[in-house]
């Protein structure tokens, strides 16, 4: 049976990965031409994209390090 820490770690890694993907997509959309239809669609959409852009900027490097450390830890546990 799998212990609770393993399940919580898997859930945490999944949430972090999804947040990194959404934030990365927001950075891509934000870097498009300002006259593009995505950024001119609505103020709420532009605000949401900006928030995810800042989240992406703040978690990109730490998130990558955490995901890599977890991967290395799982490799060491298999040995």
UniProtKB/Swiss-Prot annotation:
Induction: Expressed in the intermediate phase of the viral replicative cycle. The keyword Transport does not apply. It is a multi-pass membrane protein. Residues 1-8, 69-79 are intravirion. It comes from the Viruses. The keyword Transmembrane helix applies. Keywords: Late protein, Membrane, Transmembrane, Transmembrane helix, Viral envelope protein, Virion. This is Protein OPG081. The gene is OPG081.
């Amino acid at each position: 049976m799998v212990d609770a820490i393993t399940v919580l770690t898997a859930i945490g890694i999944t949430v972090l990965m999804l947040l990194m993907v959404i934030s990365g997509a927001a950075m891509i959309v934000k870097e498009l031409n300002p006259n593009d239809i995505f950024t001119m669609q609505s103020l709420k959409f532009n605000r949401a994209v900006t928030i995810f852009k800042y989240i992406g900027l703040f978690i990109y490097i730490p998130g990558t390090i955490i995901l890599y450390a977890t991967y290395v830890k799982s490799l060491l546990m298999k040995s």
